[in-house]
């Protein structure tokens, strides 16, 4: 058996802050905001997303803080976090495949070019419907369902259908859930 660490389909590497390659704790004071960064990538062209998960001194997980790509195409992600009580905090970076992010990137390219428009919009409607299922009933749930219904509505112009899926309201719901 090898003692080489297993790297999954979405590696998370070079997580910082780290002192002495993670052998010693990084330090901050209560209320001090600091940035956690990591290299997050995957093979192929599918999008990824990542969160920083803080664990407080009592062992409670959260809050989950969404990370953002620091420089497009760099695979370097970051998020600012703030410990709110004294004690030994830990953090980890979680990463996953982002099918909605992948669809949004592809749709922004293919739909204006007239490539596979019907299929792309149908896939988007299905993805947004699935995403809505993970959002509690209420206004945010309704935002995603409305976007899904508009994407699926063949009676509307293609540009209108796509635009409904890319609004700031939809962005906000997707970022939160």
Residue ranges and their predicted role:
Residues 3-6, 10, 18-21, 28-83, ...:
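Catalytic cores of nucleotide-enabled group-transfer and carboxylate-activating enzymes in metabolic
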Residues 66-123, 127-174:
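Extended acidic/polar, glycine-enriched regions
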Residues 30-34, 170-177:
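Basic K/R-rich, polyanion-interacting modules in nucleoproteins and related proteins
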Residues 1-43, 106-135:
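Non-catalytic, glycine-rich low-complexity segments
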């Amino acid at each position: 058996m090898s003692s080489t660490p297993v790297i999954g389909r979405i590696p998370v590497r070079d997580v910082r802050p780290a002192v002495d390659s993670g052998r010693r704790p990084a330090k901050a004071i209560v209320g001090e905001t600091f940035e956690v960064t990591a290299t997050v990538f995957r093979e192929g062209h599918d999008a990824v997303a990542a969160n920083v998960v803080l664990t407080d001194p009592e062992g409670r997980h959260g809050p989950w803080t969404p990370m953002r790509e620091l420089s497009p195409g760099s695979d370097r992600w970051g998020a600012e976090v703030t410990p709110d009580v004294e004690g030994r905090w830990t953090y980890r970076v979680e990463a996953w495949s982002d099918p909605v992010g992948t669809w949004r990137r592809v749709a922004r390219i293919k739909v204006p070019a007239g490539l596979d428009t019907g299929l792309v919009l149908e896939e988007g409607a299905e993805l947004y419907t699935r995403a809505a299922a993970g959002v509690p009933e209420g206004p945010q749930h309704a935002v995603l369902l409305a976007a899904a219904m508009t994407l699926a509505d063949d009676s509307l112009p293609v540009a209108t259908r796509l635009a409904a899926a890319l609004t700031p309201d939809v962005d906000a719901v997707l970022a939160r859930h």
